[in-house]
Swiss-Prot record:
Disulfide cross-links: none
Keywords: Aminopeptidase, Cytoplasm, Hydrolase, Metal-binding, Protease
Skewed-composition ranges (Acidic residues): 44-55
Annotated Gene Ontology cellular component terms: cytoplasm
Reaction it catalyzes: Release of N-terminal amino acids, preferentially methionine, from peptides and arylamides
Biased composition (Basic and acidic residues): 1-13
Source lineage: Eukaryota, Fungi, Dikarya, Ascomycota, Pezizomycotina
Cofactor note: Binds 2 divalent metal cations per subunit. Has a high-affinity and a low affinity metal-binding site. The true nature of the physiological cofactor is under debate. The enzyme is active with cobalt, zinc, manganese or divalent iron ions. Most likely, methionine aminopeptidases function as mononuclear Fe(2+)-metalloproteases under physiological conditions, and the catalytically relevant metal-binding site has been assigned to the histidine-containing high-affinity site.
Location of the region described as Disordered in the Swiss-Prot/TrEMBL record: 1-92
Stated family: Belongs to the peptidase M24A family. Methionine aminopeptidase eukaryotic type 2 subfamily.
Designated name of the protein: Methionine aminopeptidase 2-2
Length: 465
């Protein structure tokens, strides 16, 4: 989910970088069996884990008749046990609706892409104050932290890989959003209906389904006109999954007309460049320049015109905090002046947006979602509807971004007046859709990366992108 660039964002001098080097993967992606999606007995074992050779002990002491009877009994016993192999325990359904806790029996979720750090001489100087400030974050990177993140990432992978198979011209945006959100809630095993349940696990923010020149922050809203996917559309799918507030934010773009292939290739390459350059002590301005250099080396031919792919200037990648999709650091896609560095323990959403238009996104009409200030107080609110709505928001979403669709799913009614009051008081912030000029096309790719002490883990990486 893109973070809008602040008004004082400035462009700066060039910094040399090498964005085209490949990422050295320490451990390649696991197959389904390796990641716990398939379960069965090991070779030479029964379903109960018994070794078949153990039954042979003492066989030479038996008579021939006893051996025959024993063999028949063992064959009969094995035949009955083989029936267990036909059960679907440990397998995912299509569409994915089995909670991951029922698939990964030991509740240990697979690692994502592990990448070793590349040491740069100019990055050896550490800043003691920043180390101290982030010490608590690093200490939180324990087994529970990693397992929560890996579970959220596995949910994201399974849901999106199914959704990609049904995303075709003619499908409604509301159906896609429903499939994604139903899948996430089923796999996390938290439907989010009971008070506070959505804070345990589920959607981290409303599903973003942005077409063509809509760059970010659009989702189907109740009562709005239905939008149907067309063959010539460029669709960006951006959704987040959280487990105990640990948010995985990842996005991809789909297009059916091959004329947009170079646009998608440019943006995907730029995102991978950002992931390669990311690391402990990495300078954010260097990462930004590397991203822009790669993205703007591409062109796309539309209507017999060669159009350069441009990096969007006023939306950025961002760090992620617990229960907060946008932290206090930003990663632009263009050259910039900043002294900020990435630090050990940081979690970043490395995303890039490329456009065939002016590459500057403006607010459009409508509302994508809402975000509640964690320090918000009901003091000063005069409308009872606003007070009641604020309590519902805090109890069910906290600081997670939510949409009108989520409120109505909870059974909240007649909330418009109360919401206007909360927004006007600055207690709740609204997000508008962000658009480039009409007739242009915007693409997006995004991954979440954990900057662990000894390596970085591209937690949302999958076989699809």
């Amino acid at each position: 989910m893109g973070s809008k660039t602040p008004n004082d964002h400035r462009r700066g001098p060039n910094v040399e970088s090498s964005p085209h080097a490949a990422i050295d993967t320490i451990n390649p992606p696991k197959h389904a069996a390796a990641s716990g999606l398939l379960h069965g007995p090991l070779e030479g074992e029964t379903e109960d884990g018994e070794d078949e050779d153990d039954d042979k002990t003492g066989a030479d002491l038996k008579s021939v008749g006893q051996l025959n009877n024993s063999t028949k009994k063992k064959n009969k016993r094995k035949k009955n046990k083989k029936k267990k192999k036909t059960l679907l325990g440990g397998l995912q359904t299509t569409p994915p609706r089995v909670a991951l806790s029922s698939i990964f029996y030991d509740q240990r979720y697979p690692e994502a892409e592990i990448v070793g750090y590349t040491t740069n001489n100019d990055n050896l100087q550490r800043i003691t104050a920043e180390e101290f400030r982030h010490l608590c974050v690093v200490n939180d990177m324990d087994d529970e932290f990693l397992n929560d993140y890996r579970k959220a990432a596995e949910v994201h992978r399974q849901v999106r890989q199914y959704v990609q198979t049904i995303t075709k011209p003619g499908i409604a945006m509301s159906q896609l959003a429903q499939e994604i959100e139903d899948g996430v809630r089923a796999l996390t095993d938290h439907q989010g209906i009971e008070t506070g349940d959505a804070l345990k696990a589920g959607m981290a923010f409303p599903t973003g389904l942005c077409l063509n020149n809509i760059g970010a922050h659009w989702t189907p809203n109740p009562g709005a006109k239905e939008v149907i996917l067309q063959y010539d559309d460029v669709l960006k799918v951006d959704f987040g999954v959280h487990v105990n507030g640990r948010i995985v934010d990842s996005a991809y773009t789909m297009a059916f007309n091959p004329v947009y292939d170079d646009l998608l290739t440019a943006v995907k390459a730029a995102t991978n460049t950002g992931l390669k350059e990311a690391g402990i002590d990495a300078r954010i301005d260097c990462i930004s320049e590397a991203i822009q250099e790669v993205m703007e080396s591409y062109e796309v031919e539309l209507n017999r015109k060669i159009i350069p792919v441009k990096a969007v200037r006023n939306i950025t990648g961002h760090n992620i905090l617990r229960y907060k999709i946008h932290g206090d650091k930003q990663v632009p896609f263009v050259k910039t002046h900043t002294n900020q560095r990435m630090e050990e323990g940081d979690i970043f959403a490395i995303e890039t947006f490329g456009s065939t238009g002016k590459a500057y996104l403006d607010d459009d009409i409508g509302i994508y979602g809402y975000f509640c200030d964690e320090h918000a107080s009901a003091a000063g609110l005069h409308h009872s509807s606003a007070k009641s709505l604020l309590k519902t928001i805090k109890d069910n979403f906290g600081t997670l971004v939510f949409s009108r669709r989520y409120l109505e799913r909870l059974g909240v009614k007649s909330y418009h007046l109360g919401m206007r009051s909360l927004v006007s008081k600055g207690i709740v912030q609204s997000y508008a859709p962000l658009v480039d000029v009409p007739g242009s096309y915007v693409a997006q790719f995004e991954h979440t990366v954990l900057l662990r002490p000894n390596c970085k883990e591209v937690i949302s990486r999958g076989d699809d992108y």
